[in-house]
Amino acid sequence: MEGNAKVIAVTGKGGVGKTSLAAGVVRRLTQRYPDAKILAIDADPAVGLATALDAKVKETLDDIRLEITQGVSEKLKDTQDILSEARFRLLDMMDEEKGFAFVAIGRPESSGCYCAINSYLRDVISMLAGQFDYVVIDGEAGIEQVNRRVMEQVTHLLLVTDQSRKGLQVIQTIKDVADRLVMYERLGVAVNRITQDVIPFGNPFPDAPFVEIRNDEAQIVNDIQGKSVFELPEECELLKGADGILDALGI
């Protein structure tokens, strides 16, 4: 990976609020570093980050991947020409409003394995990271993308859980896989949506910073009303959590 981009991957079990936290991190980065080049990647086929950031999705990575595959297989153009055109379209498709660029993985039309799009996503992360100062990736729930080395060039890995044992087990599994396959420099743990004063477990990784984020009524209302993270009040729990995450990761 070229350059010194900080690539932050937000991972965890589905339903723990990682997409909202990823959006909060993007908002805080735009505020802390207004002159920096920031890229948000929605790597979850559910496409929740686009909604959370109110980002326009012109095309998705899967749209471009399909055209590359078709062009190469049908030999419509020289392979290098196709790849060069794909790179140009990738840069052109990125929404760069609100102080950040945005790319979505998309949802493959065919059912079954996401191997092809995950492989393409890995290459895209490697290519784009050198052109940005900060990259925030909202990963697919679970370990699939980590296991397929989509995240192998991530520099900062954030593990998000709630107060449940299942959420804890998922981030423990993600860390086990990431320790073998991801070249991360810093690791952080965020316990999100805390509704009780006592968390039923301590920091599972004593060497990693541990951020506690209380349940956020403002963010819940925001979601119900279909508003973006940029419409949340400055002092809400979600944005306090995003600040804590960036501080914990040394960003």
Q: Which positions does each model-derived feature cover?
A:
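Conserved lysine of the Walker
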Residues: 18
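Hydrophobic positions on the alpha1 helix immediately C-terminal to the Walker A/P-loop
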Residues: 21
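Hydrophobic anchor at the beta1->P-loop junction of P-loop NTPases
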Residues: 10
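Conserved catalytic-core segment of NTP-binding enzymes
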Residues: 31-34, 116-221
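N-terminal phosphate/diphosphate-binding loop that engages ATP/GTP or pyrophosphate donors
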Residues: 28-96
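C-terminal boundary of histidine-terminating zinc-finger modules
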Residues: 223-236
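Walker A (P-loop) phosphate-binding loop of P-loop NTPases
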Residues: 15
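Cytosolic-facing regulatory segments adjacent to core modules
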Residues: 83-97, 101-137
